[in-house]
């Protein structure tokens, strides 16, 4: 999707709810991302285990049809195991998304799930060199510190995103850690980024009408 489209919109749902997913699809989302095993800073929500979300994930994948569905399958405290990863592959999940430091190596062995790997505030130029040489499919640029969440994007941000896209030569996704306005999205595209991932900061809530 990211290589075929000039620019794409990914919806990161603030709550695992089919009504939110349906609203995102109606709003034009070209991919949908959900979570399990994590606490999410931007939304303030805690997402349950894979077992607790199994039925929801099956229903979500069926609802989305040809629209790719991705999952954050864990974080610092818990992560899916290899058996659960294989189950997700059989369900028809399209991609997984995680910060690099939380990804078990077995996740990168999957031949059926695309990898969306996030770098954080501590990335360096050496990190970008390593990403370029890696098997990562998509790079998520989660580079804003917590105190910047919900604040306006500025041109220094654009320059950093541009540098990351150029140095890594990977399709780069920018999550809405900053409160990015619709008219600002063209600057992300001009910087070489391939998608914006709209989450809780921009949605402003966890109701279908917010999505």
Please provide the spans of the model-predicted regions:
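Glycine-rich phosphate-binding active-site loops on the catalytic face of alpha/beta enzymes
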Residues: 31-41, 90-106, 139-149, 189-211
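Short, well-ordered coil/turn segments that N-cap beta-strands
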Residues: 5-9, 28-30, 64-69, 92-94, ...
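Alpha-helix-loop-beta-strand connector modules within alpha/beta enzyme cores
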Residues: 43-74, 107-121, 153-179
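Catalytic cores of alpha/beta
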Residues: 19-24, 79-90, 122-134, 178-196
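C-terminal alpha-helical cap/extension of soluble enzyme domains
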Residues: 76-79, 145, 159-211
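Conserved N-terminal beta1-alpha1 strand-loop-helix module at the mouth
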Residues: 1-67, 132
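Active-site mouth loops of central-metabolism enzymes
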Residues: 2-20, 69-80, 114-123, 172-182, ...
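Glycine/Thr-rich beta-alpha phosphate-binding loop at enzyme active sites
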Residues: 42-47, 130-162
């Amino acid at each position: 999707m990211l290589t075929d489209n000039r620019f794409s919109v990914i919806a990161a749902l603030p709550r695992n709810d089919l009504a939110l997913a349906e609203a995102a699809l109606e709003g034009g989302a070209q991919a949908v991302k959900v979570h399990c095993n994590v606490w999410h800073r931007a939304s303030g929500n805690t997402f349950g285990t894979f077992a607790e979300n199994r039925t929801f994930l099956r229903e979500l994948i069926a609802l989305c049809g040809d629209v790719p569905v991705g999952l954050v399958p864990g974080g610092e405290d818990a992560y899916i195991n290899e058996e659960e990863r294989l189950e997700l592959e059989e369900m028809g999940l399209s991609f997984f998304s995680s910060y690099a430091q939380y990804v078990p190596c077995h996740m990168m062995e999957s031949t059926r799930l695309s990898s969306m790997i996030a770098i954080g505030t501590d990335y360096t130029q050496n990190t970008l060199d390593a990403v370029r040489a890696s098997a990562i499919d998509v790079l998520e640029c989660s580079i804003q510190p917590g105190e910047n969440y919900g604040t306006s994007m500025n041109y220094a941000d654009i320059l950093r995103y541009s540098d990351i896209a150029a140095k890594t030569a990977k399709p780069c996704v920018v999550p809405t850690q900053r409160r990015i306005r619709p008219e600002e999205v063209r600057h992300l595209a001009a910087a070489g980024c391939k998608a914006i991932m709209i989450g809780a900061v921009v949605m402003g809530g966890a109701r279908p009408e917010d999505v």
